[in-house]
Curated annotation (Swiss-Prot):
<dbReference type="GO" id="GO:0000287">
    <property type="term" value="F:magnesium ion binding"/>
</dbReference>
<dbReference type="GO" id="GO:0030976">
    <property type="term" value="F:thiamine pyrophosphate binding"/>
</dbReference>
<comment type="pathway">
    <text>Metabolic intermediate biosynthesis; 1-deoxy-D-xylulose 5-phosphate biosynthesis; 1-deoxy-D-xylulose 5-phosphate from D-glyceraldehyde 3-phosphate and pyruvate: step 1/1.</text>
</comment>
<dbReference type="InterPro" id="IPR005477">
    <property type="entry name" value="Dxylulose-5-P_synthase"/>
</dbReference>
<dbReference type="InterPro" id="IPR009014">
    <property type="entry name" value="Transketo_C/PFOR_II"/>
</dbReference>
<feature type="binding site">
    <location>
        <position position="176"/>
    </location>
    <ligand>
        <name>Mg(2+)</name>
    </ligand>
</feature>
<dbReference type="GO" id="GO:0016114">
    <property type="term" value="P:terpenoid biosynthetic process"/>
</dbReference>
<dbReference type="GO" id="GO:0008661">
    <property type="term" value="F:1-deoxy-D-xylulose-5-phosphate synthase activity"/>
</dbReference>
<keyword id="KW-0784">Thiamine biosynthesis</keyword>
<dbReference type="GO" id="GO:0052865">
    <property type="term" value="P:1-deoxy-D-xylulose 5-phosphate biosynthetic process"/>
</dbReference>
<keyword id="KW-0460">Magnesium</keyword>
<feature type="binding site">
    <location>
        <position position="283"/>
    </location>
    <ligand>
        <name>thiamine diphosphate</name>
    </ligand>
</feature>
<dbReference type="InterPro" id="IPR020826">
    <property type="entry name" value="Transketolase_BS"/>
</dbReference>
<keyword id="KW-0479">Metal-binding</keyword>
<dbReference type="InterPro" id="IPR029061">
    <property type="entry name" value="THDP-binding"/>
</dbReference>
<feature type="binding site">
    <location>
        <begin position="147"/>
        <end position="148"/>
    </location>
    <ligand>
        <name>thiamine diphosphate</name>
    </ligand>
</feature>
<dbReference type="Pfam" id="PF02779">
    <property type="entry name" value="Transket_pyr"/>
</dbReference>
Amino acid sequence: MYDLLKTIDDPADLRRLDRRQLQPLADELRAFVLDSVSQTGGHLSSNLGTVELTIALHYVFDTPRDRIVWDVGHQTYPHKILTGRRDQMSTLRQLGGISGFPKRDESPYDTFGTAHSSTSISAALGMAIGSKLRGDDRFAIAVIGDGAMTAGMAFEAMNNAGVEDDVPLLVILNDNDMSISPPVGALNRHLARLMSGRFYAAARAGVERVLRHAPPVLDLARKLEEHAKGMIVPATLFEEFGFNYIGPIDGHDLDSLIPTLQNIKELRGPQFLHVVTKKGQGYKLAEADPVLYHGPGKFNPAEGIKPSTTPAKKTYTQVFGEWLCDAAELDSRVVGITPAMREGSGMVEFEKRFPDRYYDVGIAEQHAVTFAGGLATEGMKPVVAIYSTFLQRGYDQLIHDVALQNLPVVFAIDRAGLVGADGATHAGAYDLAFMRCIPNMTIMAASDENECRQMLYTALQQPNPTAVRYPRGAGTGVATVKQMAALPLGKGEVRRQSTQPAGKRIAILAFGTMVAPSLAAAEQLDATVANMRFVKPIDAALVRELAETHDAVVTVEEGCVMGGAGSACVEAMMESGVIRPVLQLGLPDRFIDHGDPAKLLASCGLDAAGIAKSIRERFVEHASGKSVKRVA
């Protein structure tokens, strides 16, 4: 099994194969991807769709000397397998294992780290120009999906690249949202070879040189060429950016891909190759439902993904989706917005029930935020459902277009804190720090499912921009209450009171997901625990009260310590003039790698045992009979 694949330890081995061996290799590679992902979990549909394209790129180009930048990067499993990581696939996305995305420190073939979309063309252009300035003759190739092409950054890069006449740049559009019928496919195969050939490029350049002295004739010739191409292929847009458009061609046909790429390799100037692929290619279940098989957990490939038979705790994403539908039922002004994350953000049911108030704006976070601001000016109640890591991309719009004008936009921030297998690129570590410094913002962190529901309702009542953050995955098992009531603004609650005498009293101020482990740690330490609820406005009165009545204060948050919720507590103490020793616990000042979420939290000292251990190490353990060390 995998006889050919076992002989490939790097692309040099691949390039030694006879062309006739490549399709059997592709079949083995596709089977290996399916087998691997079924055992580890991970992205499947997208990787099954890039097998032939990956083989063709490494076969034609001299990688890693020639650079390949994979946009988003979740489709790079075939690339990883062919570049020396075949035997490490069993560790995929696990603690200490290989990443599910390209990482520069993992392999020289991972030339640029990706995970957020639409960055590849900018990076590849920088590489291509850098290569040209150094006098190196190497290609830079950006592989970008049709979804990622909706983002403005991709077009900004193309606009920049189009004026570089001799830059060795190739942009490959991996279009998996359309299909080509066999007759059109045959025609386009011939056309792609023609358009990528040196004769076509030379003839085109020669005609332009001759006609440059007759601008009206040159303009007419260009229009005729665009019209001729436009009748067969959607070339005009990319040609307008200054690219030579080639395609579309079948991205699963090595007999089309390889000759076309070989022709392109002889050209200079920005080239644009349009390939058509199918998500889930070669695995019927994934072809039929690529969304279900986008990022599955472990499953049996012979049976496919089966619904769980054990009752599962409701996820925070489900809580949000149910709340949004309930809110829209009660108020016709509620509008739901997602930047291309309908399923991930829990908005499938909302789209079905309220299609006129559902807006998927594509991978366009900046637009999503400002679009919501515009809706708010017209009396609507926009709710932007967005992952914490992706809100970073709309930060200027959050400040300039929403907060500065004090517009009532609700931000439902999913995937706050650590996200597990997706790793550092998707971690929601920074939202508390980057939002709490913005005037007019209200920020809440949910500690359980019902509190999340009530916070979302509270946010909808506010006259200013308001954010509710909640984590990925299942909640604590708390039932949600159908009736919704607004929480007192800027007020926390004490969940546990210490019975320790003066001199040994410790107060833990916990935020969001850290309330539960803080309560568990407090049982070991007999500490007071407050569920702070609001990061902004911070409950300054509660902070002062707890500081006055306790000998030390501990803040705990699932976010970066610097500038986060703990900093807000320290600022409140300083302002009140009540100074106590403070221990701030949160995510450390480093990027947290991929792995099991519980293990990652434990490694950061943010599980119950870690919180208790940190408190004991920072302050004198109660069992010693001594008082808390007054270390400022």
